[in-house]
């Protein structure tokens, strides 16, 4: 029997299809982030100015709903993915959570919603975009030279990618394979002294899964 080379499955490129359905005023998103999540206008405006926060209408079958979009953007400015947060509670559509929480199809699994303060020299990782925004709200007066990154879950690959990119001016993920990016953090730990105690902070929930992840 001849050995066959099995090619890795290539993921379809991400396409941001919500652009025509965005709401420039961000009114419903702003109300949700203020009333339900306790964020201030100042913080919301800061993230809106960053260009990666938006409000849009999502259609699923005959159901239309307003959503907040958290865009993952590469250093080249291209959108690599996005996560969606429902604004209006609907226990019929979402019996478990009450609101939509979803990563858009074909999003880059090693990317996440991020925000830079100054010129990043360290990284702070979060489970969700709104956790990231809440952290910024609490710490914004003292934050400097840091990149905040949402993993949309607990993903070592995201930590690996953003750490390697921080140490290479963003070049690592552009020049290396998916597998190499996944292994970058372990490789850096084994072969260099670049991973210092103050380089990476993991700011996640104090639950069993998160503690196991850390």
Residue ranges and their predicted role:
Residues 6-117, 141:
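Basic, glycine-enriched DNA-binding surface that flanks or lies within the catalytic cores of DNA
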Residues 33, 137-214:
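TOPRIM fold recognition
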Residues 120-121, 199:
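Short "repeat-start/strand-capping" segments in structured domains, especially the N-termini
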Residues 124-127:
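Short hydrophobic beta-strand that contains or immediately precedes a catalytic carboxylate
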Residues 131:
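Conserved Rossmann-like nucleotide-cofactor binding loop
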